[in-house]
């Protein structure tokens, strides 16, 4: 074993993470999404520890936005995926693409229905994990 951390693609359900904190996000969804996207940028290249893997490195960040947040722009290190329909379906499609390419997706969502639709190879954490990582 080389000791190198596993590489992960962080896939964030932006609406779900925003909704996990009662900070007034509902008054300005686009503004709240923009702030969250900016907070994600420093996680590119960050090392994290997961029970399933041990040490892992976030090598890519994908953030799925929908509805009023679809018009937002993200920082360079965050790929913003604008859902044509519902965000959950976009997350499932992206996660399937990643696993088919041999990548390990780490999906951030508390949505139980979405969790059931994700491929078996996807790792899943809740918004609390991400909020703690971001110091929120």
Each language-model region and where it sits:
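Short, hydrophobic/glycine-enriched beta-strand segments
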Residues: 8-13
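Nuclease catalytic cores that cleave nucleic-acid phosphodiester bonds
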Residues: 3-4, 17-136
């Amino acid at each position: 074993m080389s000791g190198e951390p596993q590489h992960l693609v962080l896939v964030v359900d932006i609406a779900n993470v925003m909704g996990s904190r009662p900070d007034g996000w509902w008054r300005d969804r686009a503004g709240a999404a923009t702030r969250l996207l900016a907070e994600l940028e420093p996680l590119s290249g960050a090392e994290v520890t997961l029970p399933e893997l041990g040490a892992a490195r976030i090598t890519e960040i994908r953030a799925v936005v929908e509805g009023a947040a679809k018009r937002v722009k993200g920082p360079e290190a965050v790929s913003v995926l604008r859902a044509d329909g519902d965000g959950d379906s976009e997350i499932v499609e992206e996660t399937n693409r990643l696993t088919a390419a041999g990548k390990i997706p780490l999906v951030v969502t508390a949505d139980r229905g979405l969790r059931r639709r994700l491929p078996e190879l996807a790792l899943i954490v809740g918004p609390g994990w991400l909020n703690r990582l971001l110091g929120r």
